[in-house]
């Protein structure tokens, strides 16, 4: 059952609930955290969360942060660019950035090597500007 339109796309109830929970979160969330938050809305099993997350990734509405095993809402309409996530290891803040030159370099490298990427995400761990000054 489709219920919500997001960026011109119709989302199912579960997709809309997961997207809403991620949008309201102050940092990326894991699947089990999402499940706990959404139990009152009818989520009973991790598979429901994972299916919704997979579909939201396919719709380019969320990103999976591999190193954190967590998901976050896509902050921009840069679907051709490679997102770069700056992850603060002290406070847990995550910011999404885009760089056309970096994306072009990744595309060029892939083409030269005959590699066809499904997706590319870059994660940089360190300290954010607030924590580095502490």
PLM features per residue range, with description:
Residues 1-20, 69:
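Short alpha-helical segments that sit at the start of domains
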Residues 9, 23-28:
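Short helix-capping/hinge SLiMs at alpha-helix to coil transitions
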Residues 17-25, 59:
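Short amphipathic alpha-helical elements of helix-turn-helix/winged-helix folds
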Residues 28-38:
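Short acidic, hydrophobic short linear motifs in intrinsically disordered regions
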Residues 37, 41, 90:
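Residues within the alpha-helical elements of helix-turn-helix
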Residues 45-46:
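Short coil turns linking two alpha-helices in DNA-binding domains
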Residues 49-59:
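Basic amphipathic alpha-helical segments that dock to polyanions
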Residues 59, 63-68, 72-134:
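Non-DNA-binding regulatory cores of transcription-related proteins
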